[in-house]
C-alpha cells in the first residue's frame, strides 16, 4: 500500500484525498440525515400508531372488557360482542393487521391470559380465549412499561410469520385506576424498513453522484492549479540536463508564483555560471603565465647553480694550487738562507780571497745561476698571483651575475605573489611559495654580497702581493747586476778585497731583505689559501640554497600545472550548462 501510494502522482494523491474527505463528510452527513429521518419517521409512526391504538380503544366498551377479562369462557355473549368490535376496528383501520386483548396479570410461568382475539387472528393462531400465552420478550418489555407508567406504549418494530409489526398496548383500568386488561393492536410496520431502504438507496445514489461531480470538479481545479508544478517539474528536468535556456509561465496565484521564483533563480544561476566561466578562464590564463614564469625562473636558477659549480671548481683549483705556491716560496726561502750563509762565509774568508780566486769565480757563477733560479721563481710567483688576481676579478663578475639573477628572482617572486593575490583563496598556497622564493632570493643576494666582500679583500691582498713580488723582482735584478759585476771584477778581487768585503756585506743585507720578503709571500699565500677555502664553503652554501630554490620553483611549477588542470576541469563542468 505504501509503495503504491508513493507511485501516485501529486494530482492523483490530491484527488484521492479529496474523494476520501468528501466521502467522509457525505457519509457523516448521510448518517446524521438518516438518523434524523429515522427519528422523524418513527416519531410520526409512533404518533400514528398511538392514534390507531386510541381509535381501537374507543371502539371497545371498557366495561365489557373488564367483565370478559374476569372469565373469558363464561362471558361468551359479551366476548362475542367484544370480538365484533375488534373485527370492526381491524376492518376500518387499514394499518391494523390484528387486534386482541390480554389480561394484565401474569401467571407463574410469566404467561398472560388471552381475553379475546379478532377473527383473522383467531384463524391463524392456535391459542384460544381463556388460555395463557407466552408473549415475545420485546412485547413483554412494552408490557412492563405499560404496567409501570399505566400509559399506552408500543413495541419496537419486529417481524414474525405474519409480517412486520409494531404492537400498540392500551391499558384498561378499573374504577381505582388499576390495569385489568391490555388492548393490543398490531400495526403494520412494513412501511418502516421499506422507507429506510428507499432512503438509503436514494442517499447512496446522491452520495455517488455528489462524489463523482465533486471529484470531476476537484480534478479540473487541481489540474489547472497544479499546471505550474508540471511546468516546474519539466523545468527542473531540463536544468538537471544542463539546459538553462528555459523560462516558465508565471501566474499570480500561490503555486504559479513558484515559477517566477524558479525563473529568478535560473537567471541568477546563469549569472553565476558566466562569472565562474570568466573566473576559470582567468585562473587558467594566470596559471599558464605562472607556469611560464616558473620555467624561466627555473632556467635562471639552473644557470646560477651552474655558475656556482664553476666558481666552486675554480676555488677548489685555487685551493689546491696554493700548496704548490708555498713549496716554491719555501724553496726560495731556503735558497735565500743559503745565500745569506754564503755571504757570511765570504766575509770571513775575504782576506784569503786572492788565494781562492778560482773557487771564488766558481762560487760567483753558482751565485749567478742561483739568482737566475730566484728570478725565475719570483717571475713564476708573480704570474701565479697575477692569475689569482684575474680569477678574483672573474669571481667578482660571477658574483655580479648572481646578484642580478637574485634580483630577477626576487622580481619573479613578487610577480608570482601578485598573480597569486589575484587568484584570491586558490592562490594562497602560491603566495606562500612565492614568498619563500623571495626570501631565498634575498638570502642569495646577501650571500653574493658576502662573497663580493671576501673577493674585495682577496683582491686587496693580491694587489699587495703583486707589489711585494715586483719589489722582490727588482731586488733580484739588483742582486743579479751585483753578481755580474762581481764576476766582471773578480780578477780585481785580489786587488780590492776590501771592496769585495763591502759588496758581500751588501749582498748579505739584500739577502736578508729578500728572505724577509719571502716570508711575507708565505704569509700572503696562506691568506690566499684561507680565502680560497672560504670561497669553496660559501659557493657550496650558495649552491645548496639555489638547489633548494630550484626545488621551490619546481613545486610552484607543479602547483601551477595543478591549478591549470583544475581550471580546465572547472571549465568542462561548467560547459555542461547551456546558458
From Swiss-Prot:
GO cellular component: plasma membrane
Subcellular location: Cell membrane
Keyword match Transmembrane helix: yes
Keywords: Cell membrane, Chemotaxis, Membrane, Methylation, Transducer, Transmembrane, Transmembrane helix
Domain (Methyl-accepting transducer): residue spans on this chain: 293-529
PROSITE patterns noted in UniProt: CHEMOTAXIS_TRANSDUC_2, HAMP
Residue intervals passing through the bilayer: 14-34, 199-219
Residues in compartment: Cytoplasmic: 1-13, 220-579
Signal sequence, renumbered to the chain: none
Family assignment from sequence similarity: Belongs to the methyl-accepting chemotaxis (MCP) protein family.
Protein name (Swiss-Prot/TrEMBL): Probable methyl-accepting chemotaxis protein BT9727_0355
UniProt lineage: Bacteria, Bacillati, Bacillota, Bacilli, Bacillales
